[in-house]
A protein has these predicted regions:
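Outer-membrane beta-barrel pore domains
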Residues: 170-375
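Outer membrane beta-barrel
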Residues: 1-124, 128-166, 241, 246-273, ...
C-alpha cells in the first residue's frame, strides 16, 4: 500500500463576527481551503444575560472537548481518531449556562449542512420521499473545582447525545458508518471503516473527559463511544458499538502559561513566556476500535510527539512525528493489503492473513509540518 507525501492548505477561513448590540451576537464563518466555499458557522445568539447564551443556526454541538476546541489552539496538527465519533456542526438551537465552577449546554439539532452534497440530499429526501430531517438531542455538563486557583484549572466533563437518522447522510438514509483516517489530512486512506451499517433506528453517543493546566503544563484525556441501534425489521443484528480514547499533554519550556476559556469550557490561546515567544513540547497516545459486534472496521493506535513554536500570539509553527499501528481488520473496506495468505501473497482479506497477533495490518511512520496564522 503506497502512501504518498503531500502538501495542502489545511484551512483558509474567512469569517465575520459582530456583537450587534449589548444583547445580540451574529457570526458567519466559511472555509475556502479546497477552492470552494464550505459553510462552517452561521449563528445568531442572545447573550444579554450574564452567564447565559441562547443561539440558533449552524454550529458545533457541545459534546467533545477536542471537537469544540478551535483548530487554532489544538495541541497537535490533527484531532485524535476517535473524535470522528463526536458530532460536529449541525443546524440547531442550543442553550449554554456557565459560571466559574459549573458549565452546562443542551440543544436540539437537525441536519448537517457543510456543502452542496448534503443540501441536495436533504432537499431530495424531503421532495421525493417526504422524510423528516432527523433530530438529535445533545447535553453536556462540566465541573471546575479549581476555579479559585489563578495558575491552574481542572475540567471534569461528560456529554450524551441521542441521534435520529439524518436526511443529509451521503452514505444512505437510515444507515450508520464509522470511519477515520490515522490523525492526518495528507494520507487520505481511511484504514478504519465499518462501511455502511443498514437499518439504523437511532444512535447513542457519550463521552467522559478530563482536562486542565498548571502553569505551563496542559493535559487532556477522553473516552468516547457511539452505538448504532438497529431496526429489527430491517437488520436483525444487535447494537453496534465503536469506541476509543486518548491522553495527551504538553509543556511550555520558557515560562509561558496555558489558558482555559471558562465561557466555552475548552483550552484557549497560550501566554508566551518570552518576548520572542515560546516553545511547547507535546506527547499523545490514542486508541480507536471500530470492530463492532458484527462489522470489522478495524482498530488502531497512534503515538505522537510534537513541537510547537509561537513567535507571536498569532503565528504558530508545528512539527509532528507520528507512528501508526493498524490491525488486520483495518483494510479500508477491503481496499488495502493487511498481510499475507498461506501462499505468501499479499492479501486484503483479513480472514486469510497468516501473520500472528500484532503482526498484520498497515504500520507506518509520519512526519508533518504546519505554518499557521491564527487570528
Amino acid at each position: 500500500n503506497h502512501i504518498g507525501n503531500g502538501m495542502s492548505i489545511r484551512r483558509a477561513r474567512f469569517a465575520v463576527k459582530a456583537q450587534l448590540d449589548r444583547n445580540w451576537y451574529g457570526e458567519i464563518d466559511t472555509d475556502w481551503a479546497d477552492g470552494i466555499c464550505e459553510l462552517k458557522d452561521a449563528i445568531l445568539a442572545y447573550n444579554g444575560v450574564p452567564g447565559l447564551e441562547i443561539k440558533a443556526g449552524n454550529f458545533k454541538e457541545s459534546f467533545s472537548i477536542q471537537r469544540n476546541t478551535t483548530s487554532r489552539y489544538l495541541m497537535f496538527m490533527e484531532r485524535p481518531m476517535v473524535t470522528s465519533l463526536a458530532p460536529s456542526r449541525h443546524l440547531g438551537l442550543n442553550l449554554t449556562y456557565s459560571n466559574k465552577w459549573f458549565w452546562f449546554a443542551g440543544g436540539v439539532f437537525g441536519p448537517e449542512l457543510k456543502g452542496a452534497e448534503e443540501a441536495t440530499a436533504m432537499k431530495d429526501n424531503n421532495k421525493d420521499l417526504g422524510r423528516n430531517a432527523g433530530l438529535s438531542y445533545t447535553g453536556k455538563v462540566v465541573f471546575r473545582p479549581l476555579y479559585k486557583c489563578s495558575e491552574s484549572a481542572l475540567h471534569l466533563g461528560g456529554a450524551i447525545s441521542y441521534r435520529e437518522p439524518k436526511v443529509t447522510s451521503t452514505d444512505a438514509y437510515g444507515a450508520a458508518r464509522y470511519s477515520s483516517r490515522n490523525s492526518t489530512s495528507i494520507n487520505r486512506k481511511k484504514y478504519l471503516d465499518t462501511d455502511v451499517i443498514t437499518g439504523l433506528d437511532h444512535e447513542l453517543a457519550w463521552t467522559a473527559e478530563l482536562a486542565g493546566f498548571y502553569k505551563g503544563l496542559r493535559y487532556e484525556g477522553a473516552y468516547l463511544t457511539r452505538g448504532a441501534f438497529l431496526d429489527k425489521k430491517i437488520n436483525n443484528l444487535g447494537t453496534q458499538w465503536a469506541d476509543g480514547w486518548y491522553a495527551q499533554a504538553s509543556y511550555l519550556l520558557f515560562g509561558g502559561r496555558q489558558n482555559y476559556d471558562y465561557d466555552g469550557a475548552k483550552p484557549t490561546r497560550i501566554t508566551p513566556g518570552r518576548s520572542w515567544g515560546d516553545v511547547e513540547l507535546a506527547v499523545r497516545y490514542e486508541y480507536c476500535d471500530f470492530n463492532t459486534a458484527d462489522y470489522f472496521g478495524g482498530s488502531a493506535e497512534t503515538f505522537s510527539f510534537g513541537i510547537n513554536f509561537y513567535p507571536t500570539k498569532n503565528v504558530k509553527f508545528v512539527i509532528n512525528y507520528q507512528y501508526n499501528n493498524n490491525d488486520r481488520y483495518a483494510n479500508g473496506k477491503g481496499k488495502l493489503f493487511v498481510g499475507h495468505d498461506a501462499a505468501g501473497n499479499p492479501t486484503k482479506d483479513y480472514t486469510k492473513v497468516v501473520e500472528g497477533a500484532g503482526k498484520a495490518g498497515v504500520d507506518y511512520h509520519m512526519l508533518a509540518m504546519r505554518f499557521q496564522v491564527a487570528f
